[in-house]
Amino acid sequence: MTNYNSNDNRFNGRCFLEDVEIKLQKRLEEIGQSLSDGQKEIDNMQEYYWENYTEMDEYGYEDYDNQQALLHQVNANNEKLQLKHRFEKMLDAPFFGRVDFMYDGDDEPEPFYIGIGNFAEKTGMQPLIYDWRAPVSSLFYDYDKGPASYEAPAGRLDGEILSKWQFKIQNGELVYAFESDTKIDDDILKKELGTNSDVKLKNIVRTIQKEQNAIIRNTKDRILVIQGAAGSGKTSIALHRIAYLLYHERDTLKSSNILILSPNSVFADYISHILPELGEENIREMSFDLYAYKELRKGVAADCEDRYDQLERRMKFPDESAQNRFDWKQSKDFIGEIEGFLAILEDRLIEFKEIEFRGMTLTEEDLIQLFYYKFTETPLLKRMDAVKDYFIDSWETLKGRNISEDDQEMLQMKFDKMYTTKDIYTIYNWMLDDCGCDLLLEVPYEKRKLPYEDVFPMLYLKYRLSGGNSTHKNIKHLVIDEMQDYTYLQYTILESLFHCRMTILGDRAQTLDTKQQDVLRFLPKLLGREIRTIEIKKSYRNTLEIARYAEKVSGVSDLELLDRHGKEVVEKTFNTDTELLDELVCHLKCPGDFETAALITTTEEEAFDLSRLLKLRGINVSYVDRNSSAFKKGLTVTTFYLAKGLEFDQVFALRGAKENPLKNQAEYICATRALHELYVYEIADSLSK
């Protein structure tokens, strides 16, 4: 036990907590008063503006000055409001760690308390509590007692860690405090992981491990690819990395510059609170599938088959030839087919016709020269527009006047008529015909529904013919979750859309394909930029009993497992669905101390039927399907593919049919959702319809 500086309250966690809570309260009162004064100032400015704007100078200088002053005050109030929210969060648990560090050349150690944010008595003063992302905080995560160093803005600072402390504070009360010899004590880690699951992903600032910290604080690698086992904390690591980057690059990187590609809305809701909890604004999230559907509804097809419909069909009606066709259409080889088709498309698509307009002529030879040489870099379906604009600019320059809107529309029609068609759906069918594939139905736009296997090939063709979507140019960091479920074609499209830093994460064992796809084999070559791959083999989520069971299902046996024990996995077979329901009702009416439970099925039909039957038995059920946007405490009934990324205290997994090609993946994903208890059930007869 450390006993230096016994008269300095900074080395007494309980005394320091009492002191810092008083100072936090005082700062909150000051900020509250400042916010009130600022709002009065804003109200006065707005009142002055509306009373006097008609008398302001004709050049608008006074108007501009007033608007700028108002904007400055609004921004100042917003910053204070964010600070207020952070301090209110800190009041509940101001800090969770402390490092007593003695710099080389000093005689006395300096205590550094670590929390979710910086806190000082006054702006500009030395912090009493340091943000977990601050350079000095790396001492807490990366070192034991003894020699240590950290990288400060001025350079590396060396010294010695004399002691490290870990604290748990709830509602402003100290629950425990102890001196730790290790980085993050295993007992603390097991205690944290042994608590019940919530309906939201937990932040991990109190228990970040050394290998996790290295990933979070990585700023050197432009593209970071993380292969992490189920329960390794890879999603938490990615979100904490984003929080770290937002903190250290706050002058150039904002929340609006970051985009997460997540698998579904339920998962997006599950992770949505992490960044606000860490003191940052939330970031944009989208599903790449939904993005593709939206893009293709712009003039290509009125509807697209949902990915989950395609997945359900594969499970219910296994068809090897259909799966092979799907795989081929998402492959590098099929991209080659599209590119080969595009190379010869121009002759088939364009018929040049001389343009004459009010004394100015564009001959076929002129058109060919402009189309094939001057504007060769312009996408094919946009190229004639470039030629038209060139012609109009030339005419207006020669004549010294502008062309009327009616004449512009007439010229647009003339240039458009040189295309045999501009319908990408029709052009895609030409390509399918050239490849010897079955064609899509030749129907009007409003009756078109793209099979899922054609969604991303069609999107790729659209972007090659018309150019990509430029609305994401402000994105400076892209996070891709569940990387194993993206195809080569999807990564190719993403690479063309986003020229930015990336954090890509997933687990090859949780693929939604019949074969494990190791994207690490092709990502370095495809992305062709600075890329680093990291594999995390330590799993924290499950008890040892559940983790060992999951290993048997997946065949993955090289994981490092936390030595946290619990109940053995229960496997049970029932003759009818009635017997299964009796068993479930018995468990669910006596849930014990668990806050979250899940009944996870293979197919959507099974999930829907079971949720309906359980409701008839008086069980409170939250049914989660592809259209859900959140899940609640209590019992969730859903499919394995929607449960990916989530965790529950207790899981009841229903085995699928033996002929289901995704049976093993489904069982592995179900098993690895369980924190404390896992029941694996099977029924001989199909569920009641």
Provide a role label for each language-model segment.
Residues H85-L91, R98-D106, G155-G159, Q166-K168, ...:
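A general structural signal for short secondary-structure junctions and capping/turn motifs
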Residues G194, D198, W328, E377, ...:
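Conserved phosphate/pyrophosphate-binding and hydrolysis machinery centered on Walker-type P-loop NTPases
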Residues M1-Q39, D43, K191-Q310, I669:
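P-loop NTPase Walker
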Residues Q82, F112, E160-T195, V199-H273, ...:
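Conserved motor-region signature of P-loop NTPase helicases/translocases
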Residues R98-D100, V225, I260-S262, Y679-E682:
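A structural signal for short, well-ordered beta-strand segments and their strand-loop junctions
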Residues M1-V205, Q209, N213-R217:
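Extended, charged low-complexity regulatory segments
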